[in-house]
Amino acid sequence: MSSADPTATKRDVRLAWAIHALTASGVLLGAGGLEAVVRGHPRTAIVYLIAAMVVDGIDGPIARAACVMDTLPGMDGNILDLVVDYLTCVMLPVAFMAYFHIFPPGWTVILCAAILFTAVLWFARTELMTEDNWFRGFPAIWNLVAPTFFLLRSPQWVNIVVTIALCVLTLTEVKFVHPMQVKHRRVVNIVVTSLWLIAMLVQTLLWPKDSLPLQIVLVAAPAWFAFITIERTRRGAPAPAA
């Protein structure tokens, strides 16, 4: 184990612990979301999912900027992040899809088991990302998939097909973008991700009323990421920096 940065001050140590606490707070949001699911409150559950996504999106850049790994080498932020992500990105969305009938009764157990199984294998990969910071395989972001299914009221057969495809892609070498870390089109990807989350939140607050503009965003955002996934995978070589 590497030693702590000898130049780190008490303030640096406190900041590092605070950032780890921010990451760990995702389990509290996940627990709140699970309670909402069990109580039959889909809107509340989605709000918890979105809050967890926001935390997951900001803790990494903050940790890297604060050099947390150097300050607290005895705490592995990557492992902490993976543990939290499996709860908020996989287990909570699976519970959501099971409780709120995203799939037909005969398919629910099979597909939920497939999601849990393929996702845990993905999290165990030793090389999760390419040299230019694209994910290898579908990165188990079911926290985006499940609310999108629900808010779009997509037909159950569509949900089945998409879920099977994503489970298969989880264990492949298909390249999926990390909006924050991939330099190529970073601004566009962050904007699209932000619009997706905003549309998801507003449509959730409006539910059960549907908004056509918001529904369009909920379709267009994943369509954009599907396009750049195909583009990057077909190219093979690392994407240009800009």
Identify the role of each PLM range:
Residues 1-6, 135-242:
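C-terminal membrane-associated helical module and adjoining short loops/tails
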Residues 7-68:
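Active-site-proximal cofactor/substrate-binding loop regions of enzyme domains
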Residues 11-21, 75-83, 128-136, 179-187:
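Short, amphipathic, aromatic/basic-enriched membrane-interface segments that mark the entry/exit
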Residues 118-141:
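Membrane-anchoring/interfacial helices and their immediately flanking loops
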Residues 32-48, 83, 87, 91-112, ...:
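Helix-coil boundary and interhelical linker segments in multi-pass alpha-helical membrane proteins
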Residues 19-24, 65-122:
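Multi-pass membrane catalytic core of lipid/isoprenoid biosynthesis enzymes
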